[in-house]
Amino acid sequence: MDSKHQCVKLNDGHFMPVLGFGTYAPPEVPRSKALEVTKLAIEAGFRHIDSAHLYNNEEQVGLAIRSKIADGSVKREDIFYTSKLWSTFHRPELVRPALENSLKKAQLDYVDLYLIHSPMSLKPGEELSPTDENGKVIFDIVDLCTTWEAMEKCKDAGLAKSIGVSNFNRRQLEMILNKPGLKYKPVCNQVECHPYFNRSKLLDFCKSKDIVLVAYSALGSQRDKRWVDPNSPVLLEDPVLCALAKKHKRTPALIALRYQLQRGVVVLAKSYNEQRIRQNVQVFEFQLTAEDMKAIDGLDRNLHYFNSDSFASHPNYPYSDEY
């Protein structure tokens, strides 16, 4: 079944496919691989493609999309393409140039969705992660409401069809929602979300504000050594997920993805393996029972794989609050 028929309506009237393809890969993976796997994903039925300035793959991902348009597989309007504003570009005058740069790299006229990648502003400049002589990350202090106003201007200019945020907590979302003169609400909040960190309170809050929660690391992350504790439990080896996979004759990954869809969460499936990319679109072919869902709900242990210790002292560190 083609996943493009399964969409959620955003608060600005646009539609987002509920299954997305995540394109991030650790630096040791050759960039050319992003081109190859994004093409495979589109061939398999993915229509929602998630990238970012941080991923350093927008040229390859854009080329993959354009090549599938050129060969007649899809039209541009069939594809929902997301990019993200990196933390070194939060100052309002840097927002539009950053988006224009992303569009230039992807060679696309617009993005379907542009997100503030993180609430934690960093010192502007070429470095993705600017550090001082002691190796400490250099923060910047920016009023994110001014960043948001610059995002709104990008939507008005037609450079982004929709705008949203990522890695925001409730307080940070409320700051935007309560901003005097708010023109557009964020359509979504893209956060780490999986059975070990199910974000149920944040999900309920987002639903109450007509903001879609989008899950990244829905399969428990790629366990990139730079971010993830190698001793943390491996989500897809969880006995409950494995038992449900056996029961439904599916993979544990499909159980984890289906869980999110049934909670009303848009889910990103990241894989650089052809067989698993094809498997992941089977998420629409089966259903979990209420008991299955309850069993998966019970796995929550408030475990975030992305261990941002170097950012814990940032005034906008999102995990300082309960949710």
From Swiss-Prot:
Mutating R226Q leads to what result?
A: Decrease in the retinaldehyde reductase activity. Exhibits changes in both KM and kcat values
Binding-site residues, substrate: H117
Name any Gene Ontology BP term: prostanoid biosynthetic process
**Per the record, what is the consequence of mutating K75E?**
No effect on 17beta-HSD activity
Q: What is its EC number?
A: 1.1.1.-, 1.1.1.210, 1.1.1.53, 1.1.1.62
> Which family, according to UniProt?
Belongs to the aldo/keto reductase family.
Q: Output the CDD domains linked to this UniProt entry.
A: AKR_AKR1C1-35
Indicate the enzyme's highest-level EC class: oxidoreductase
The catalytic activity, as recorded, is: a 3alpha-hydroxysteroid + NADP(+) = a 3-oxosteroid + NADPH + H(+); a 3alpha-hydroxysteroid + NAD(+) = a 3-oxosteroid + NADH + H(+); prostaglandin F2alpha + NADP(+) = prostaglandin D2 + NADPH + H(+); prostaglandin F2alpha + NADP(+) = prostaglandin H2 + NADPH + H(+)
Activity regulation: the record says: Strongly inhibited by nonsteroidal anti-inflammatory drugs (NSAID) including flufenamic acid and indomethacin. Also inhibited by the flavinoid, rutin, and by selective serotonin inhibitors (SSRIs). The oxidation reaction is inhibited by low micromolar concentrations of NADPH.
Subcellular localization, as worded in the UniProt entry: Cytoplasm
Q: In which tissues is it expressed?
A: Expressed in many tissues including adrenal gland, brain, kidney, liver, lung, mammary gland, placenta, small intestine, colon, spleen, prostate and testis. High expression in prostate and mammary gland. In the prostate, higher levels in epithelial cells than in stromal cells. In the brain, expressed in medulla, spinal cord, frontotemporal lobes, thalamus, subthalamic nuclei and amygdala. Weaker expression in the hippocampus, substantia nigra and caudate.
- The site feature described as Involved in ligand recognition and product release is recorded at W227, F306
Write out the GO MF terms: 15-hydroxyprostaglandin-D dehydrogenase (NADP+) activity; 5-alpha-androstane-3-beta,17-beta-diol dehydrogenase (NADP+) activity; aldo-keto reductase (NADPH) activity; aldose reductase (NADPH) activity; all-trans-retinol dehydrogenase (NAD+) activity; all-trans-retinol dehydrogenase (NADP+) activity; androstan-3-alpha,17-beta-diol dehydrogenase (NAD+) activity; androsterone dehydrogenase [NAD(P)+] activity
Pfam families associated with the record: Aldo_ket_red
Q: Which organism is it from?
A: Homo sapiens (Human)
Its function?
A: Cytosolic aldo-keto reductase that catalyzes the NADH and NADPH-dependent reduction of ketosteroids to hydroxysteroids. Acts as a NAD(P)(H)-dependent 3-, 17- and 20-ketosteroid reductase on the steroid nucleus and side chain and regulates the metabolism of androgens, estrogens and progesterone. Displays the ability to catalyze both oxidation and reduction in vitro, but most probably acts as a reductase in vivo since the oxidase activity measured in vitro is inhibited by physiological concentration of NADPH.
Active-site residues from the entry: Y55
Q: Know the name of this protein?
A: Aldo-keto reductase family 1 member C3
List the residues marked with site Lowers pKa of active site Tyr: K84
So, what pathway does this thing act in? Steroid metabolism
| GO CC annotations, alphabetized | cytoplasm; cytosol; extracellular exosome; nucleus
Tell me which UniProt keywords the record has, alphabetically.
Answer: Cytoplasm, Lipid metabolism, NAD, NADP, Oxidoreductase
**Site feature (Important for substrate specificity) residues:** L54
Identify the residues that bind NADP(+).
23-24, 50, 166-167, 190, 216-222, 270-272, 276-280
